[in-house]
Design a protein with these regions (language model features):
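Single conserved hydrophobic/aromatic residue that forms the stacking wall/gate
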Residues: 2-13
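Active-site and channel-lining beta-strand-loop segments
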Residues: 24-33, 40-41, 89, 98-120
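Secondary-structure capping and boundary motifs in well-ordered enzyme cores
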Residues: 36-41, 76-79, 117, 128-129, ...
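Glycine- and acidic
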Residues: 65-75, 152-160, 214, 252
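Catalytic adenosine-cofactor/nucleotide-binding cores of aminoacyl-tRNA synthetases and other
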Residues: 107-200, 291-317
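Basic, alpha-helical terminal appendages of large translation-related enzymes
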Residues: 215, 220-221, 230-318
Length: 318
C-alpha cells in the first residue's frame, strides 16, 4: 500500500493539464463532444463517470445517497493514476464526495512472471471453476493474496491449500459431526449441557471471532480474516481429537453430545463468516445443520433440530 500511496502522490506533483478529447480522425468510436463534433471523449474520462451514474447520480437521489460515497474503491495498481488523480479531480469539480478510501491491489503472477498472452502463461479462472468449483477458487484467491502486494499462482499451491484448509479442516469436521449425530442421536442435534473448561474455551474464542474478523475486513486484510477463521476451525478439530466423542459416546452420551453441539456451533459460525467468500458451499453446510438464521453470535445452533443429509463439502483432490 505504501508504494501505491507514494506513486499516487508523485503523480499529483508532476501532473500537467489532461486532454480529455481525441480527434475522430484518430478514433472513430467514442462519445462525441457536445461542443465539437470533430472530437470524441477520452475513454478514461467517460468511463470513470460510470462509477456514480450506475448508482443513481443525477437520476435517483435516494439510491445515490445509499451507495455513494464508496467505502472502498478497489482498483488494480496499474490504473492507480487514473483513479487516484484524474477521478478525484473530476469529483471535486462536480462537487461530488470522494470515495472514503482508494485501495490498489497487486497482480497475480504465474510463478514469478506477470501473466501475458504472449508468454502463454495466463491462467483461465473459468477452467479452474469448471474443474474445482467457484467457491474454492474464490477462497484461494482471497486467502493467498495480501491485498496491496503481488501474489503467485501455481496449480500445486491451489491444490495444497484446497486439501489442507477446505477438505481436511473444514469439510472433514462437518463430516465427522454430522456422521456421529446421525449414528448416535437419531440425526438430532444434542443438548449442549453443562460446559467443561475445554468447551468454554471454544465458546470464548467463538464469541470473539466475529469482531476480530470484521476488523481485519475493515483494514482490507482479507487473508488474515480468513486465516483467523481457519485457525478457529483447526482448534475445533484439535478439540474433537482430544475429546474423542466417538469413544466417549459409549459411556457418556451426554458428554459426547455436548462436544458435538460445540463443534457444530463452531462450524455454523465459521460458515456464516466465510459465506461472503464461499456462498454456495457454506449454504450447503448451513442447510446440513438445518440453520436458517445468519447470525455472528455464539449459541444460535438449536438443540433438538434434525440435521439433513449432504454431499461431501470439499472432496479431496488427488
Amino acid at each position: 500500500r505504501d508504494e501505491s500511496e507514494s506513486r499516487g502522490l508523485g503523480d499529483v506533483y508532476k501532473r500537467q493539464d489532461l486532454c480529455i478529447s481525441r480527434p475522430k480522425s484518430r478514433l472513430e468510436w467514442g462519445i462525441e463532444l457536445p461542443f465539437d463534433k470533430q472530437y470524441v471523449t477520452y475513454v478514461w474520462f467517460d468511463a470513470l463517470i460510470n462509477y456514480v451514474t450506475a448508482v443513481g447520480f443525477n437520476q435517483s437521489s435516494e439510491n445515490f445517497k445509499k451507495w455513494w460515497p464508496a467505502s472502498y474503491h478497489l482498483i488494480g495498481k496499474d490504473i492507480l493514476t487514473t483513479h487516484a488523480v484524474y477521478w478525484p479531480t473530476m469529483l471535486f469539480s462536480a462537487g461530488v464526495s470522494l470515495p472514503l478510501s482508494i485501495f490498489a491491489h497487486g497482480w497475480w503472477l504465474t510463478g514469478e512472471s506477470k501473466m501475458s498472452k504472449s508468454l502463454g502463461n495466463v491462467i483461465n479462472p473459468m477452467d479452474l471453476i469448471k474443474d474445482y468449483g467457484v467457491d474454492p477458487v474464490r477462497y484461494y484467491l482471497m486467502r493467498e493474496m495480501v491485498l496491496g502486494n503481488d501474489s503467485s499462482f501455481t496449480i500445486e499451491s491451489f491444490i495444497q491449500r484446497y486439501n489442507s484448509d477446505l477438505a481436511n479442516d473444514f469439510g472433514n469436521l462437518l463430516s465427522r459431526v454430522t456422521t456421529l449425530i446421525k449414528k448416535n442421536y437419531d440425526g438430532v442435534i444434542p443438548e449442549p449441557g453443562d460446559l467443561s473448561d475445554l468447551d468454554l474455551s471454544i465458546k470464548k474464542k467463538g464469541e470473539a471471532l466475529s469482531k476480530t474478523v470484521h476488523q481485519y475486513v475493515d483494514d482490507m486484510r482479507l487473508n488474515d480474516a480468513i486465516e483467523e477463521i481457519m485457525q478457529f476451525i483447526r482448534g475445533v478439530n484439535k478439540y474433537m481429537e482430544e475429546n474423542a466423542p466417538w469413544k466417549m459416546v459409549k459411556e457418556d452420551k451426554d458428554g459426547a453430545g455436548r462436544i458435538l453441539y460445540t463443534a457444530g456451533e463452531a462450524l455454523r459460525l465459521g460458515a456464516v463468516l466465510l459465506s461472503p467468500i464461499m456462498p454456495n458451499r457454506t449454504k450447503t453446510l448451513l442447510d446440513a445443520l438445518n440453520v436458517k438464521e445468519r447470525n455472528f453470535s455464539w449459541g444460535i445452533l438449536q438443540a433438538g433440530t434434525r440435521i439433513k443429509s449432504h454431499e461431501p463439502l470439499f472432496p479431496r483432490i488427488k
